[in-house]
Amino acid sequence: IVAGVAEGCVQAGAALVGGETAEMPGFYPEQEYDLAGFTVGVVEKSKIIDNTKMQAGDAVIALPSSGVHSNGFSLVRKIFNVEYADIWQHYDELSGTLGETLLTPTKIYVKPVLALMEQVDVRAVSHITGGGFYENIPRALAAGCVAKLEKKSLRMPPIFPLLQKVGKIPRPDMFNTFNM
C-alpha cells in the first residue's frame, strides 16, 4: 500500500508528509481495511485558473481516462454482481481479466495538465468524478458558456462499452455516472 501511495506521489510531484493508521477492532472484517487520502497544493495567485476569460470558440481538450477510477463502482458491482462474479473471467473487449481491468490504477493528471498550462492559456479544468460529464463540465464553464463535445472523438477505455452492454445502461446514463 505504502509503495503504491509513494508511486502516486512521485507521479504527481507531491510529498508524502504524514499518515496514521487508525486501529478499529471489530469494525472491519479480518483482512479488510479502508484507505483514504487527500492532497493540498499551493499556487501563485497569478497562476490561478480563472474561467472569466473563457469565450465562444475556445477549444475543449479531453485527457483520456485510464478506466473506472473511483466513480460508479456501486453500479459496477451491481452489473457484475461482484460478490459472485468471476473476476478472473476474460472478456473479448478487455486486454486482461475483469478484475485486472477494474483494478487499473487511476491516472494522475497533474503532469499532463501542468505541461498543457505551459503551452496554452488554460481557462478552466474539470475533473470528471461522480456526476460524470453532465454535472462536472458545467461547473467549470463561465456564465453563458456551453461546451460542445464530439463523443466519437473521445478515446474510451474498453471497460465502459462493456459495462454499458452487460448492464444495459443507456448512453446518457453512462456519461452521467462514469469518467469515460
Predicted regions located by residue number:
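Glycine-rich anion-binding loops of enzyme active sites
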Residues: 1-74
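Glycine-/charge-enriched secondary-structure boundary and capping motifs
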Residues: 3-9, 28-35, 85-87, 92-103, ...
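Glycine-rich beta-alpha junction loops
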Residues: 41-43, 60, 64-69, 77-80, ...
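Acidic, glycine-rich loop-and-beta core segments that form the ion-binding/anion-interacting portion
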Residues: 54-100
